[in-house]
């Protein structure tokens, strides 16, 4: 790829080459983007883009660090509170491309 890549191309390359799944904050820091909402928007679009190439954007779901509740929603946006114990100590979802 050339040196001039879009933010989405950078995210795709980052998620494809990373050994461990990455959080939205880690992705934002690595591509130099301050707005997490843009990264969330990009991830939703990237899921469609990589599917055309025969790959998948995989998401490790968010989890409550207090009670262990695993969020079932396939939403990219991280939850704010646990529905079971109301804790805000949430491990954010992690993403990778395989």
Predicted region positions:
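Short alpha-helical segments that sit at the start of domains
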Residues: 1-10, 72
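Short helix-capping/hinge SLiMs at alpha-helix to coil transitions
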Residues: 16-19
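A short acidic, leucine-rich amphipathic alpha-helix
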Residues: 26-28
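Charge-enriched amphipathic alpha-helical scaffolds
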Residues: 34-56
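Short metal-coordination and nucleic-acid-contact micro-motifs, chiefly zinc-binding Cys/His arrays
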Residues: 60, 78
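Short cysteine-rich clusters marking metal-coordination/redox-active sites
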Residues: 63-67, 82-85
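Cys/His-rich microdomains that often coordinate metals
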Residues: 71, 89
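Short metal-binding segments enriched for Cys and/or His
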Residues: 90-98
């Amino acid at each position: 790829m050339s040196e001039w890549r879009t933010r989405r191309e950078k995210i795709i390359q980052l998620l494809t080459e990373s050994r461990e799944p990455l959080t939205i904050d880690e992705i934002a820091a690595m591509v130099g983007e301050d707005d997490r909402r843009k990264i969330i928007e990009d991830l939703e679009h990237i899921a469609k883009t990589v599917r055309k190439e025969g790959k998948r954007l995989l998401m490790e779901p968010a989890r409550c660090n207090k009670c262990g509740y695993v969020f079932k929603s396939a939403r990219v946006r991280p939850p704010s509170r646990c529905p079971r114990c109301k804790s805000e100590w949430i491990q954010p979802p992690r993403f990778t491309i395989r």
